[in-house]
A protein has these predicted regions:
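Conserved catalytic core of the tyrosine transesterase superfamily
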Residues: 1-212
Length: 212
């Protein structure tokens, strides 16, 4: 202020690097918590089959909620076991595990035709009125199953995305491959998950080592 107003000749703050803001590590679910969460939808009616397919797909691919609800039926290639995800920047091809393929097949063949209001509807996931699922609608679904599972962590759609990345890293996946699947433009966005794993190891050490 003093320099800008002309009270002093030099700016003493010039060249001083701004303080680094510590990046908060994302919250993730353990593998057991994910399994419990994915078990919550009951495949006894249309809603249960749809919700099960959505949650399996979200964890199988790590896509964003905006990408999930934007998926069209033509973005799936279930025989080959992958989905095509088109973001604003580029297209990604992401593989699916068998359980996600099965959940999607059950939904598409047996449930989606009952839900869509218009046979020309292209949306993969629709609400109970037959229209494309909204972010708010999916958020409510996530919260419902969090409460049903009794998981104390605050689960959001992004929690499954974070968990997807960390679990792949824990099991030896290449960081660049994870970056590609997540659609990160910068590898530094993906590297944050390595810090999560380091923190987990430190917690395990502190709890288990007799001299910690």
């Amino acid at each position: 202020y003093l320099y800008r107003e002309g009270y002093i000749d030099a700016n003493p703050a010039r060249g001083v690097a701004p303080a680094k803001v510590e990046r908060k590590l994302p919250q993730i679910l353990t593998s057991k918590e994910v399994e419990l969460f994915l078990e919550q939808p009951e495949c006894t009616d249309a809603k249960g089959y749809r919700d099960h397919a959505m949650l399996e797909l979200l964890y199988a691919t790590g896509i964003r909620v905006s990408e999930l609800i934007a998926l069209d039926i033509g973005d799936l290639n279930l025989p080959a076991g992958f989905i095509r995800c088109s973001s604003s920047k580029k297209e990604r091809i992401i593989p699916l595990y068998h359980g996600a393929v099965k959940a999607l097949q059950d939904y598409i063949k047996g449930v989606r035709p009952q839900l869509i209001a218009d046979t020309e509807e292209t949306a993969l996931f629709v609400n109970m009125n037959g229209e494309r699922m909204s972010r708010q609608g999916f958020w409510k679904i996530i919260k419902h199953y969090q409460e049903k599972a009794g998981i104390q962590k605050d689960i959001t759609p992004h929690t499954l995305r974070h968990s997807f990345a960390v679990h792949l890293l824990e099991n030896g996946a290449d960081l660049r491959a994870i970056q590609e699947m997540l659609g990160h433009a910068d590898i530094s966005s993906t590297q944050i998950y390595t810090h999560v794993i380091k923190n987990q190891l430190k917690d395990v050490y502190q709890k288990a080592h007799p001299r910690a």
